[in-house]
A protein has these predicted regions:
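Conserved helix-turn-beta segment immediately C-terminal to the redox Cys motif
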Residues: 10-29
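Short, conserved sequence motifs used for protein processing/export or organelle targeting and
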Residues: 28-216
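Conserved redox-active cysteine motifs that mediate thiol-disulfide chemistry
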Residues: 1-12
Length: 216
């Protein structure tokens, strides 16, 4: 909230989403010194333990910053467009991910299906998490405080991280189906939430990603 350049970063991401549509999945991780809640922002705390872990893992020390596919970065906002273009041009289409989400008494049930399009000869894991949009709060915009800023794609609590998907890899045509339950934080507005799922290789790099909006 106290990152004066983050609204500009958001504008860049919005433009990239307009360009790439569903091919580009954005998740906003609030961490670091600018994210610490204070009275000035009504103590709104959008940090998560997983977000803090990601910040440490990728050595984030300035904001806004981005990591693409857990592989490229961290990058300042001036490099995002070029690097995303390069990523789409050079990344092999190895698999498709299909998702379903249903709110149940036990929590949010997410169904995941992975269809391999080529042979992948290494162990694969899957990570799933919830993002929430239209969270209202205070945001510093180049020194001007916006009182009713709308935060988008915010990483929320209780992710499911690096779960085994295929310990020996997949062959072209293989299909893997799994179900996962999320414990839901009562503060979530499910009408504004989405589930993000990505498959990673043994180096932790993202091979494919998808997201689905949650219907309450």
């Amino acid at each position: 909230w106290n990152c004066p350049n983050c609204p500009d970063g958001t504008s860049i991401l919005n433009n990239l989403k307009e360009t790439y549509g569903e091919r580009l999945v954005v998740s906003a991780v609030h961490q670091g010194s600018f994210a610490k809640p204070k009275a000035e922002n009504n103590n709104l705390d959008l940090r998560t333990p997983y977000g803090d872990d990601l910040g440490s893992k990728f050595g984030l020390s300035s904001w806004p910053n981005a990591v693409i596919n857990r592989k490229i970065g961290p990058l300042g906002r001036g490099d995002w467009e070029t690097k995303i273009q390069e990523c789409f041009a050079n990344t092999e289409h190895l698999m498709n991910i299909s998702l379903g989400a249903e709110n149940t008494q036990q929590g949010l049930l997410v169904s995941l299906q992975v269809d391999a399009l080529k042979d992948i000869n290494e162990a694969l894991t899957v990570t799933l998490f919830i993002t929430e949009s239209d969270i209202k709060g205070v945001q510093n915009n180049q020194g001007v405080m916006i009182e009713d800023y709308s935060f988008q794609h915010v990483l929320r609590n209780n992710p499911i991280v690096d779960m085994p998907l295929a310990t020996t890899g997949l062959k072209d045509g293989d299909r893997v189906s799994k179900n996962y339950y999320f414990t839901l934080d009562k503060s979530l507005n499910l009408n504004n939430c989405a589930v993000v799922a990505f498959v990673s290789n043994s180096a932790g790099e993202v091979l494919q990603v998808n997201e689905i909006e949650v219907e309450n």
